[in-house]
Design a protein with these regions (language model features):
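Conserved ABC transporter NBD signature motif
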Residues: 59-70, 74-75
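Conserved ABC nucleotide-binding domain
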Residues: 115-137
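Catalytic Walker B motif of ABC-type/P-loop ATPase nucleotide-binding domains
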Residues: 157-161, 166
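ABC transporter nucleotide-binding domain
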Residues: 174-259
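Short, charged/small-residue-rich alpha-helical element at the C-terminal edge
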Residues: 227-298
Length: 311
């Protein structure tokens, strides 16, 4: 499988601040790869380096086998980029801004295929292209960048919090467009802190913390790293006593709940069957639980800061 993005030991320092501290990331061709972490973890810095907008301090970074700093012009012809906070020209209409962005990637407003795609996307995203940029809300500015990105085919889509400011219906349209470009063979790097979005869209996920990738793999692979929740009808936690591999046994809301290492679930089922439990549910860990495995301590610290609201 061809690797589209590769970084190894990537570092970026701003003075004494280490924004990236040995980041290793691999994104293969045709994947939708989730890049997950809170603000300040290093996601946007990584993306700026991959786009040739920032120069790395150390380590290696390549896109399509080329250096993103030295070969930025050639690479930008193959890349569509959507930031999380879009600025538009105040005196250009939305349609003019879209056409200008598309021209930078080789499209022309006289190209019938491009104009048809632009109009389809404007309708799908419920976007009014005749208004001036200064009249657009944050969500509509986001639509300008999304339409410009999706209207011209790209080999790689780098999307940094792309649904910021969109309402739920427009988020659905965004997911449809990701499915479309994926089916066409494009590669997508999706940076987000919206766990449900990443879980629905991505083939693989990399979790970043303090400038390093701390977990990377498919959701199935990552789920093996944490426990699965098992529950059944009952009011007494003693009903689960003695089950091999059971952890965190509690009874609440008429159900007995416990957790078990994900690779031990199959071995536990005969034990549960022997106890004639009813209403059995087995829930694999969600992406949120995987995420909290690495960031739970930070959230506890924030909740304990001052009045509990965090800063």
């Amino acid at each position: 499988m061809t690797t589209v993005i590769r970084t190894g030991g990537l570092t970026k320092h701003y003075g004494r601040v280490r924004a990236l501290d040995g980041l290793d990331l691999t994104v293969d061709e045709g994947q939708v790869h989730g890049f997950l972490g809170p603000n300040g973890a290093g996601k946007s810095t990584t993306i700026r380096i991959l786009l040739g907008l920032a120069r790395k301090t150390g380590g290696a970074a390549s896109v399509f086998g080329q250096d993103p700093w030295n070969d930025a012009v050639a690479l930008h012809r193959r890349i569509a980029y959507v930031p999380g906070d879009v600025s538009v020209w105040p005196n250009l209409s939305g349609g003019e801004a879209i056409d200008l962005m598309a021209r930078l990637r080789g499209a022309s407003r006289h190209d019938k295929a491009y104009t048809a795609e632009r109009e389809r996307l404007a309708e799908a995203f419920q976007f009014e292209p005749r208004k001036k940029g200064r009249a657009y809300s944050k969500g509509n500015r986001q639509k300008v960048a999304l339409i410009a990105a999706f209207a011209v085919p790209a080999d790689l889509y780098i999307l940094d919090e792309p649904t910021s400011g969109l309402d739920p219906l427009m988020e659905v349209m965004f997911r449809h467009e990701i499915a479309r470009v994926r089916a066409a063979g494009a590669t997508v790097l999706l940076s987000s802190h919206i766990l449900s979005e990443v879980e629905q869209l991505c083939d693989r996920v990399s979790i970043i913390r303090a400038g390093r990738v701390v977990e990377s793999g498919t959701l199935a692979e990552l789920r093996h790293l944490t426990r699965t929740e098992v529950s059944f009808e009952g009011t007494d936690a003693a009903a689960a006593a003695g089950i091999p591999g059971a952890h965190d046994i509690v009874a609440d809301d008429g159900r007995v709940r416990l957790t078990v290492d994900s690779d031990a679930v199959a071995g536990m089922l005969p034990e549960l069957a022997a106890r004639n439990v009813t209403g059995l549910r087995v829930a694999p860990p969600s992406l949120e639980e995987l995420f909290l495995r690495h960031y739970g301590d930070d959230l506890v610290a924030l909740e304990g800061n001052g009045d509990g609201r965090g800063r």
